[in-house]
């Protein structure tokens, strides 16, 4: 799974020994249940806009918030691609990975600096009531000018969405206990 992910591993010798004695493939059902729960829990963080530790995500920069077209009040959500890109994968008898394969998933999870190289661009502007305004491609009467945008750095704050909260930990234990209880019947 490309992008970023969190791995959950069952490392309890008693549970693993019990799995080894079962006729069922080890952990197949419980690992899928854990993966489904963790995927759902991770997706829910986009509604609460909080990290697994319960802290609020850092707010949007005012300039970006002002020009954001969709979901203006939502952090890490423009069209929902990051949230809908959360998936889980059972990778072993006792392991589930939860993550996203979107190319920008890691920068949002961990934060960091994005280096933007210098580039050429065409700027379109128009004048209205003595003010200079940017104009779209189709705007008639706009003046075009080629400009050089210098190299610069964009600093992205970490807004962790992957991880296990205290509530997740309790639910994981409940799912495993429920599953172990069902094996004993």
Place the predicted regions along the sequence by residue:
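Short, Lys/Arg-rich flexible segments
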Residues: 1-185
